[in-house]
């Protein structure tokens, strides 16, 4: 069983004497990569003007949780695996356990907020700026930390060193049923909700794309001479300008059009997100109501030629957010399944340690995903690394 007295801080076992060096090496990589990557991410969000959006505060919050883990907690995990002994006492073992689960819960809650934001952006664009207003998003971010700490603080007396994973965690036996409920809420309900949101986003995008294709065909059949203008007469577009959200002003070139666009904001800052995000019902209504004369008189809308690129940007940002969620879920699934299927710890201790060490990945992988899947983050990272200390002048 995962049980030990508070005075026992040893996780020594002959079967893991060789494996501990693998764990230590992996832990050092996670600590260094995660610290550097997450610091770069925070600097990029602060320095790059196009990344300074309210929605990107969610990314900053996720980054802070990862930075807390990689910089403060991971070195102690490495030390414990190296010596197979927790060397910093019972009190800090409790602090470690509380911060460990608090950072994980903040990450899960933030992933939920990101998925919710992407869904509202495409399905309920008028509701998006209301939910993610300046006050709303600050309240949401503060709430993630308050809820995360408050939910695991009651376990303070039962945080111990769990020998089978050589980590300070809560005592599984003494923590029941509270810990079982908490794990179910965060890892089952929370992560499932994120997955459902992305499924809904995919379905909405697919429907919108079909509706747009039908609309274009309708417009082409009405007047063949205006085929080139069908994209310019699209039934709606999302323009994501954070400054206009903050001021409450109308989007450029939209107020005079028969179909209003939803002004929103995303991880891409000032980029527009178009086309695929159209509501299918609105597209069909527009196709049915638009007479030939209206089509013939349709005038180009400023920025409409960027629609395909903007639509692509929405897809790229959403895929990046989904990749972050997927990596988090995949890093924890083996650990969670092993704890459920092997509650009596019959499997070799090395297997439990491998599963636990895989969860370290979620603390350092996000900056890699941002760099690989987001052009603006990639450029910001490059600029900071090239300019060095001179990059900080942009903060003044």
From Swiss-Prot:
It holds the Pfam family 7tm_1. The modification Phosphoserine is found at residues 221, 224. Expressed predominantly in hematopoietic tissues. High levels detected in the bone marrow and lower levels in the peripheral leukocytes and lung. Also expressed in brain, heart, muscle, colon, thymus, spleen, kidney, liver, placenta and intestine. Within the leukocyte population expression is higher in neutrophils and eosinophils relative to T- or B-lymphocytes. Residues 48-57, 116-144, 202-320, 374-396 are cytoplasmic. It is found in: Cell membrane. Keywords: Cell membrane, G-protein coupled receptor, Glycoprotein, Membrane, Phosphoprotein, Receptor, Transducer, Transmembrane, Transmembrane helix. Residues 247-260 have a biased composition (Low complexity). G protein-coupled receptor that responds endogenously to dietary fatty acids or nutrient, specifically medium-chain free fatty acid (FFA) with carbon chain lengths of C9 to C14. Capric acid (C10:0), undecanoic acid (C11:0) and lauric acid (C12:0) are the most potent agonists. In immune cells, functions as a pro-inflammatory receptor via 6-OAU and promotes the expression of pro-inflammatory mediators such as TNFalpha, IL-6 and IL-12B as well as stimulating chemotactic responses through activation of signaling mediators AKT, ERK and NF-kappa-B. This is G-protein coupled receptor 84. It comes from Homo sapiens (Human). The gene is GPR84.
């Amino acid at each position: 069983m995962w049980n030990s007295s508070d005075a026992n801080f040893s996780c020594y076992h002959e079967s893991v004497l060789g494996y501990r060096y693998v764990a230590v090496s992996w832990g050092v990589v996670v600590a260094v990569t995660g610290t550097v990557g997450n610091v770069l991410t925070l600097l990029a969000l602060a320095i790059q003007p196009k990344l300074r959006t309210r929605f990107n505060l969610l990314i900053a919050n996720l980054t802070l949780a990862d930075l807390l883990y990689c910089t403060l907690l991971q070195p102690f995990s490495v030390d414990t695996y190296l010596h197979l002994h927790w060397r910093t006492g019972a009190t800090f073992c409790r602090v470690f356990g509380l911060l460990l689960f608090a950072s994980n819960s903040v990450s899960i809650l933030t992933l939920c907020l990101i998925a919710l934001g992407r869904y509202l952006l495409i399905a309920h664009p008028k509701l998006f700026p209301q939910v993610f207003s300046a006050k709303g998003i600050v309240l949401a971010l503060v709430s993630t930390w308050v809820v995360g700490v408050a939910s695991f603080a009651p376990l303070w007396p039962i945080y111990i060193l769990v020998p089978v994973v050589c980590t300070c965690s809560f005592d599984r036996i003494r923590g029941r049923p509270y810990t079982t409920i908490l794990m179910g809420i965060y890892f089952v309900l929370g992560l499932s909700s994120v997955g459902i949101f992305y499924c809904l986003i995919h379905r909405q995008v697919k429907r919108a794309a079909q509706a747009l294709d039908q609309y274009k065909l309708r417009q082409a059949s009405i007047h063949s001479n205006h085929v080139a203008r069908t994209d310019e007469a699209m039934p709606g577009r999302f323009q994501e300008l954070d400054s206009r959200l903050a001021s409450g002003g109308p989007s450029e070139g939209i107020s005079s059009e028969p179909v209003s666009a939803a002004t929103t904001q995303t991880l891409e800052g000032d980029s527009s997100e178009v086309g695929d995000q159209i509501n299918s019902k609105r597209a069909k209504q527009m196709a049915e109501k638009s007479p030939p004369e209206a089509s013939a008189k349709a005038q180009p809308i400023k920025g409409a030629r960027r629609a395909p690129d903007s639509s692509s940007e929405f897809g790229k940002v959403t895929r990046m957010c989904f990749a972050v969620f997927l990596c988090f879920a995949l890093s924890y699934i083996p650990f969670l399944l092993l704890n459920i299927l092997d509650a009596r710890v019959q499997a070799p201790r090395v297997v439990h340690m491998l599963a636990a060490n895989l969860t370290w990945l979620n603390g350092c992988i996000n900056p890699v995903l941002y760099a690989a899947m987001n052009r603006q983050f990639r450029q910001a990272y490059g600029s900071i690394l090239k300019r060095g200390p001179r990059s900080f002048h942009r903060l003044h």
